[in-house]
Amino acid sequence: MNIENIKSQFPIFSKKINGKSLVYLDSSNSSQKPMCVINRLNDFYKNEFSNIGRSIHSLAVNATNKFEETRISIKNFINAKFKEEIIFTKNATEAINLVATTFGQQNIKKGDEIIITELEHHSNYVPWHFLRETKKAIIKFAPINEDGDIIIDKFKELIT
C-alpha cells in the first residue's frame, strides 16, 4: 500500500495550509472524498438523481436499484450474513448515536459497563456519556500504548 498514491486520489490533499501539507483527522462527521467519488456523485446528481425507494418512475427505480446494489457490495465486502444488516447513515456520528439511543437505551441497565478508549473522537464519547447519565451505566477507558494501540492485557482486565 502506497500512502502517497492513495493521497493523490484526494484533491484536497494537494492543498497547503500555512505552507504545510494538509493532514485531516476529523472524519467522524464528514470525510474527504477521492476524485472517483466526486466524479460519480457529480454524474449521479446531473443524470440520475431521484428519491430512493419512494417512487416507481424510471429515475427512482434506477436510483433504488443502485442503492440496493451498493448495500449488497458492502455486505459482501465486510462478509455480513444478510444485506439487511447494512444500514446507511449520514456519518459515523449519526451511526454511533443510533446504536447508543436504540440498542443502548433498550439493553443497558444500571451498573452495566461501557468500554471505550482514551483516544475516542468526541462523537464517540458523548452518546455513551448520555447513556451513562440516563441509565446509570459505568464508562471504563481502555488504555492505549505510545503507538495508539489498545493494550490488550489491560483491556481484558476491564471486562467483568
Model-derived regions: residue spans:
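Pyridoxal 5′-phosphate
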Residues: 1-160
